[in-house]
Amino acid sequence: MTDTSPEQRVHDLLVIGGGPAGAATAYWAATAGLDTVMIERKTFPRDKTCGDGLPPRAVHQLDEMGLGAILEGYHRFDGLRAIAHGRTMEMAWPDHPVYPSYGYVVRRCDLDAFVADHAVGAGATLLQGTEGLRPLDPPSGSPKGAIGGAVVLDKASGNEHEIRARHVVIADGANSRFGRVLGTTRDRTYPMGMAIRGYFESPLHDDPWIESSLD
């Protein structure tokens, strides 16, 4: 059953997806005083297959959000060590007037949780275990292609309800389910990579390089 109460509140912004992109969006919107709601279909802390490496530009963005002190508790790396066909190259991050010359390795289960918490601390509302199902029609007179929010599913109860918003940011990943409802598709002629991720102990755990083997 979907709650369609006509007196339902209209938020300034609905963010669909609580990963780093969605949570950063929610943080900056809430900081600017916007009434912001962010939904995430899983519950934090939750994992995601990823290399866990934050390059300098990502470090800069997180530092701008006030998260630099948290990052300092994680492993710092200064560049990339590439190994291919018996050759090894160590490539340091270049000096830049804005971005730092280092990155950090942060597990996604940690990163996603503390960025989302930071958005909540700034005033955003986070609904975990909530999945965006389909868009709502916008008010009359809205620009072509606009949507007025989303019908969402509370996965714990199985109930659907509407979240209305003046603006919607869809940040639920490359395989966006909500995006597919809007008509986005993946070009199957474009190359796609697959990944397997695992954690293990290594004598190189404190090495200042992240290592990539290209053989």
Language model regions located:
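Short, mixed charged/polar active-site loops
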Residues: 8, 88-90, 158-162
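Beta1/beta-strand and adjacent pyrophosphate-binding region of the FAD-binding site
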Residues: 5-21
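Conserved Rossmann-like nucleotide-cofactor binding loop
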Residues: 21, 44, 175
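Glycine-rich FAD pyrophosphate-binding loop
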Residues: 27-50
